[in-house]
């Protein structure tokens, strides 16, 4: 049943079928034209599907069974930290005092929620080594943009209008150069060396009086710790630039190392990744930004403060970059992250990193004989393989990813980072058991052997899914975004 094709909800529709009946009107009827201008009133009825409640329940249940999520199976998507989301988080987020409040309520009536937000900020300050944190940004890339706007405001306040360039490594997340561009900067690429780390000599070459910031993920997207980070920070700071920390890989250093101690001036976090907010379905996320003291004046307003009279939002921020989101951030995700941090404690967070790193290194060593290992050294929370040897036999990394679907696994991240040919990036996270890891590894080994003995099986995969291979070029260039009702059959 899971792999059967599913009709569109419009195709299930039958004229006259009713899903829900409204009770008889017991108040005076109000005509739409008495309330709305004619421009806002439909001339024709909306073409909505006519289905029963049972039809719609079966339809969406069937669709949900075709989805893959952390609760249904292993999800080794590199640089995405698809860890299990503890269900206690959901219970706490549904407390009436959190779920039934509104951001326009008087501050005096939501002191408990504000206390949670303030305490969460304090925990994140301790975890990152920053001086303060704002919870306003909605997700990772939004946090990146916010952090870069803070850096821009800082430089402009100091009269440094010529600092128009942001440096990113060739292994950087794609959102880094995108966020820099949206924030009004020009992106400059710094190369990696033969060890997969930022090339210090190339960094010295590109850093100058026009440098606004260097954006880094540490460990980087290859899963390798930038061991020269203190020297890199000195190079950037001596040139008058700022050091930005992309928190996508914070799961690798929790309670082990802090960005603030490495010399970073700004950090964004992904609460929906590192701190177990559910993600993968389009949102919501949460991307708090932490800063050092000299950037505090520019934080988006309002900022949450604690006084002897309780908690309040301070809007008196003349140098602030303004708001970056309505209200105060994605509160529900913040509740979940707070619950996770309090449940784990410092020792638990330290164990998170230890098991995440252990799992990644175990998988890397077991798979290394069957796939190319571009950087043969200890990794952190994730690692990168290459399908170069499989490509020589006519099988691409894309084919390997499609074959994994036949075994019920979500594929790893592929073709990223861009500086590794036929890249396969795997992040197991700390929440997976050895048995789960071994099951995935065994299938990866099986696929490697199939490439050598029967490559057509891999080249033509997937074989068991409802949808085989999409025409991705056509889907991108000519997407079908609306249902077109079939024309009446001419008799």
From Swiss-Prot:
Q: What is its EC number?
A: 1.4.4.2
Q: Which cofactor does it need?
A: pyridoxal 5'-phosphate
Q: Which reaction does it catalyse?
A: N(6)-[(R)-lipoyl]-L-lysyl-[glycine-cleavage complex H protein] + glycine + H(+) = N(6)-[(R)-S(8)-aminomethyldihydrolipoyl]-L-lysyl-[glycine-cleavage complex H protein] + CO2
Per its UniProt record, what CDD domains does this chain match? GDC-P
Q: Which UniProt keywords apply?
A: Oxidoreductase, Pyridoxal phosphate
Q: Does the keyword Nucleotide-binding apply?
A: no
Q: Which residues carry this modification: N6-(pyridoxal phosphate)lysine?
A: 273
Enumerate the Gene Ontology biological process terms: glycine decarboxylation via glycine cleavage system
- Where does it sit, as one GO cellular component term? cytosol
Q: Which GO terms describe its molecular function?
A: glycine binding; glycine dehydrogenase (decarboxylating) activity; pyridoxal phosphate binding
Q: Which InterPro entries match?
A: GcvPB, GDC-P_C, GDC-P_N, GDC_P, PyrdxlP-dep_Trfase, PyrdxlP-dep_Trfase_major, PyrdxlP-dep_Trfase_small
**What SUPFAM superfamilies does the record point to?**
PLP-dependent transferases
Q: Which HAMAP family match?
A: GcvPB (MF_00713)
Q: Which family does it belong to?
A: Belongs to the GcvP family. C-terminal subunit subfamily.
User: Briefly, what is this protein's role?
Assistant: The glycine cleavage system catalyzes the degradation of glycine. The P protein binds the alpha-amino group of glycine through its pyridoxal phosphate cofactor; CO(2) is released and the remaining methylamine moiety is then transferred to the lipoamide cofactor of the H protein.
For this protein, the record's PANTHER family field holds: GLYCINE DEHYDROGENASE (DECARBOXYLATING), MITOCHONDRIAL, GLYCINE DEHYDROGENASE, DECARBOXYLATING
Self-association state and partner proteins as the record states:
The glycine cleavage system is composed of four proteins: P, T, L and H. In this organism, the P 'protein' is a heterodimer of two subunits.
This chain's protein is named Probable glycine dehydrogenase (decarboxylating) subunit 2
Which species is listed as the source? Bacillus cereus (strain B4264)
Q: Please name the gene that encodes this protein.
A: gcvPB
């Amino acid at each position: 049943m899971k792999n059967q094709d599913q009709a569109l909800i419009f195709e299930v529709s039958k004229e006259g079928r009713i899903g829900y009946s409204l009770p008889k009107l017991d108040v005076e009827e109000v005509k739409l034209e008495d309330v709305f201008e004619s421009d806002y009133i439909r001339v024709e009825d909306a073409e909505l599907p006519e289905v029963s409640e049972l039809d719609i329940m079966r339809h969406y249940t069937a669709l949900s069974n075709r989805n893959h999520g952390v609760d249904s199976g292993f999800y080794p998507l590199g640089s995405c930290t698809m860890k299990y989301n503890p269900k206690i988080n959901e219970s706490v987020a549904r407390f009436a005092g959190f779920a039934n409040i509104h951001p326009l309520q008087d501050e005096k009536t939501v002191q408990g929620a504000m206390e949670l937000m303030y305490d969460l900020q304090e925990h994140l300050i301790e975890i990152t080594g920053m001086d303060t944190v704002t919870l306003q940004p909605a997700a990772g890339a939004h946090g990146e943009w916010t952090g870069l706007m803070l850096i821009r405001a800082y430089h402009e306040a100091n009269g440094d209008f010529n600092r128009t360039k942001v440096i990113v490594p060739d292994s950087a997340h794609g959102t880094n150069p995108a966020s820099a561009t949206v924030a009004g900067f020009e992106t400059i690429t710094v190369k990696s060396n033969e060890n997969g780390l930022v090339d210090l000599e190339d960094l010295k070459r590109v850093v100058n009086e026009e440098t606004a910031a260097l954006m880094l993920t540490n460990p980087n997207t290859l899963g390798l710790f930038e061991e020269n980070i203190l020297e890199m920070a000195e190079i950037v700071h001596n040139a008058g630039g700022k050091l930005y920390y992309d928190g996508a890989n914070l799961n690798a250093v929790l309670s082990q190392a802090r960005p603030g101690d490495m010399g970073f001036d700004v950090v964004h976090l992904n609460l929906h990744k590192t701190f177990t907010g559910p993600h993968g379905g389009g949102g919501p996320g949460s991307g708090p930004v932490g800063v050092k003291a000299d950037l505090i004046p520019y934080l988006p307003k309002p900022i949450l403060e604690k006084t002897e009279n309780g908690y309040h939002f301070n809007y008196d921020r003349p140098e602030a970059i303004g708001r970056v989101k309505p209200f105060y951030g994605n509160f529900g995700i913040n509740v979940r992250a707070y619950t996770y941090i309090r449940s784990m404690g410092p020792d638990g967070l330290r164990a998170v990193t230890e098991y995440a790193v252990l799992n990644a290194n175990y998988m890397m060593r077991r798979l290394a004989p069957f796939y190319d290992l571009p950087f043969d050294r200890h990794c952190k929370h994730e690692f990168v393989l290459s399908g170069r040897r499989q490509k020589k036999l006519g099988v691409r990394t894309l084919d390997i990813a499609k074959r994994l679907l036949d075994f019920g696994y979500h594929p790893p991240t592929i073709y990223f980072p861009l500086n590794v040919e036929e890249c396969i990036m795997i992040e197991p996270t700390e929440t997976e058991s050895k048995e789960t890891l071994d099951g995935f590894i065994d299938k990866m080994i099986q696929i490697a052997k199939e490439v050598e003995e029967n490559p057509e099986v891999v080249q033509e995969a997937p074989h068991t899914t409802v949808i085989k291979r999409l025409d991705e070029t056509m889907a991108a260039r000519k997407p079908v975004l609306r249902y077109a009702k079939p024309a009446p059959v001419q008799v």
